[in-house]
């Protein structure tokens, strides 16, 4: 009898201990998960800079379309944005999305190249490097190698240059290319999306993801007449074209009507290789002509060299105008935007930090999107 009692008691105690351990384990797991959530959430908040990102409308636009569920659109126009003496090849694409692609100025869209080819070409074979090779037609009509089309679908992101009140969406895309080595000297290879973009024609289908990013204007920029400094290299000018169209209520059907109440001051530092490489030149000249008291543009050409034969870049121009630049940022309370090659970020931040009063409050006025 005693043995049976001891056995039952031991079973009960072990059960309680087991339950206690399970409860403790579940509590610990919840605490760990909660801590992880807080860490990620806090990091996410810091990355997003919620000063500008608390717009509910904007949050509804983010990732509305994904790689698994993209939006099928049509190319309605394709324009070469550079002139003959530019070493680059850059296209402006105008895309009809039937009003379905929602975005704010400063957002990016993703383009999925070869969307149909990845599924519908029976001659595609996968090699060991997980690239797709077309066994019947290794190059397309423009002699562009297809060996770099990736098996796994992914999108390349491009800044939107149109305003969200316009019928069509537009982007500027630089074509990246490089020559094949001695094995195939007559073949030019293109970047993952570049070959696809180069071959696009009007009325072709194109698949978009997005909208993406948080490189946007303050919600109250027009009401408060916020001053701005825009720094760009190459295609980094695209979001600023979008910003200008928003701030000045641009209407391509009524170009000479001033419909905006915005009276702030905008300084643009734009670095490109030479004069023929300026993107959206017509738009920039239009805004400067229409609003001469509101816009000042500094073009910086890298083909011009310093005395030591090194190239002169946009960050060098800003350093040369350091006093003027810091005066705009500190005394005119400008919101500073940096978009383009990642090298410009460090030099500009060094200039800002050289001022004794560059604190966390001012840091919140700096917005960066580099590549």
From Swiss-Prot:
Gene3D superfamilies: Nucleotide-binding domain of ferredoxin-NADP reductase (FNR) module, Translation factors. Pfam families: NAD_binding_1. Keywords: Apicoplast, Disulfide bond, Electron transport, FAD, Flavoprotein, NADP, Nucleotide-binding, Oxidoreductase, Plastid, Transit peptide, Transport. Residues 1-18 form a transit peptide. FAD binds at residues 68, 155-159, 172-179, 192-194, 235, 342, 371. CDD domains: CYPOR_like_FNR. Its EC number is 1.18.1.2. It catalyses: 2 reduced [2Fe-2S]-[ferredoxin] + NADP(+) + H(+) = 2 oxidized [2Fe-2S]-[ferredoxin] + NADPH. GO terms for cellular component: apicoplast. One of its GO terms (biological process) is regulation of isopentenyl diphosphate biosynthetic process, methylerythritol 4-phosphate pathway. Belongs to the ferredoxin--NADP reductase type 1 family. This is Ferredoxin--NADP reductase, apicoplast. It comes from Plasmodium falciparum (isolate 3D7).
